[in-house]
From Swiss-Prot:
Species of origin: Shewanella sp. (strain ANA-3)
Disulfide bonds: none
Protein encoded by which gene: cmoA
Protein name stated in the entry: Carboxy-S-adenosyl-L-methionine synthase
Coiled coil: none
Subunit annotation: Homodimer.
Highest taxon in the source lineage: Bacteria
Keyword terms: S-adenosyl-L-methionine, Transferase
Origin organism lineage: Bacteria, Pseudomonadati, Pseudomonadota, Gammaproteobacteria, Alteromonadales
Family as reported in the entry's similarity comment: Belongs to the class I-like SAM-binding methyltransferase superfamily. Cx-SAM synthase family.
InterPro entries in the cross-refs: CmoA, Methyltransf_25, SAM-dependent_MTases_sf
GO BP terms: tRNA wobble uridine modification
Pfam families per the UniProt record, alphabetical: Methyltransf_25
Amino acid sequence: MNASQDTIYAQASEHISDFQFDNRVAGVFSDMIRRSVPGYTQIINTIGDFADRFVKPNTQVYDLGCSLGAATLSIRRQIQGRDCRIIAVDNSESMVTRCQENLNAYVSDTEVELICGDIRDIHIENASLVVLNFTLQFLPPEDREALIAKIYHGLNPGGLLVLSEKIRFDDAPIQSVLEELHLDFKRANGYSELEISQKRSALENVMKPDTLTLHQQRLTRQGFSHFSLWFQCFNFSSMVAIK
């Protein structure tokens, strides 16, 4: 996955459009997410480790919101020879096109079905692992519960959901300090104040983070009885829930 440098918001613009996973973003996404999301590489690698432990032979794996395929590739490396199928879904044609190129670059005996479509329309069945890696936060809040319910019903007993999300905090001082530390992380990775400000404006209407408590309550309501936060750096997190 050769990454071009993200300079999308480097020039001042009078009108900042809502963030979209279009061709411009797809072309720099690997660089963008590495410089914007603390711990992203660790999360991707650990998703593969979870797959090694939870994916059962002759079952299916779902990567919902697969972007360029980083999680799918991490999973596929760990489940060779299990006669499984990975269903990777993204609603951005640009992302799916580049994802297919990334998948084609590696030989594997594990089938990947790559779908350009809405994750809310995907039928989930016989699943031993479902991954939502920084995806749920982009759905309208009113649609999130139904998706979690669909995932729960499509998972086999003992199956795992990995849910990575930017989170918000009801505690104002905690929200403030962790948000500022995240901005420092982006500054340290070469983003200017202009880039940070303009991207924040672009994301304002399309990404709505939940609190960790809300995530856990939603998962519990839909039937998940085992839950843990396994990763957090500033306001970025990854959780697991077992059916």
